[in-house]
Regions:
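Short, Lys/Arg-enriched, Trp-marked, Pro/Gly-tolerant hinge/linker segments that flank
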Residues: 1-19, 26, 35, 40-41, ...
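Terminal helix-turn-helix DNA-binding modules in bacterial transcription factors
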Residues: 21-22, 26, 31, 54-93, ...
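Residues within helix-turn-helix
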Residues: 35, 46, 82-85, 95-96, ...
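Residues within the alpha-helical elements of helix-turn-helix
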Residues: 40, 89-90, 105
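Short hydrophobic/aromatic patch on the recognition helix
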Residues: 47-48, 52, 97-98, 102
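…primarily DNA-binding HTH/wHTH and HhH modules…
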Residues: 100-122
Length: 122
């Protein structure tokens, strides 16, 4: 029947997670939260968190952070946009926090990463 809820159907679960991931990929620059996404897809926070991790292989915050950092690297490759502006463009209001997340994920801060790209001719 077409009335199965997201918790009752494996296909529906995969579909809502796929839709949520696509939404994040598109709106990564918005202030996305677990509670906001859970509300959007009409599920409890704990359920959203559990099935997102199961289907995507990483938790929501890591997925969102990775998506934002990948987008930031893309902007770095496109030109000389100010790093604080790039941080804002990918959804970070606080450059210090962006720097911390970037460093944690990439092993170096955004400034060093950009310098390494220039040295490598990227």
């Amino acid at each position: 029947d077409g009335d199965a809820d997201a918790e009752g159907s494996c296909d529906n679960t995969k579909e809502f997670v796929r839709q949520a991931a696509a939404y994040i990929d598109t709106y990564y620059y918005e202030p996305l939260t677990l509670s906001g996404l859970s509300e959007r897809y009409h599920v409890e926070n704990s359920y959203f968190s559990k099935v997102f991790r199961k289907e995507m292989g990483e938790n929501l915050i890591h997925y969102l952070s990775r998506t934002r950092i990948e987008k930031a690297i893309g902007y770095m490759q496109q030109g000389s946009t100010n790093l604080a502006e790039i941080a804002f463009m990918v959804g970070y209001d606080d450059y210090t926090y962006f720097n911390k997340v970037f460093r944690k994920m990439m092993g170096v801060g955004p400034r060093e990463y950009r310098q390494n790209m220039k040295e490598d001719g990227v």
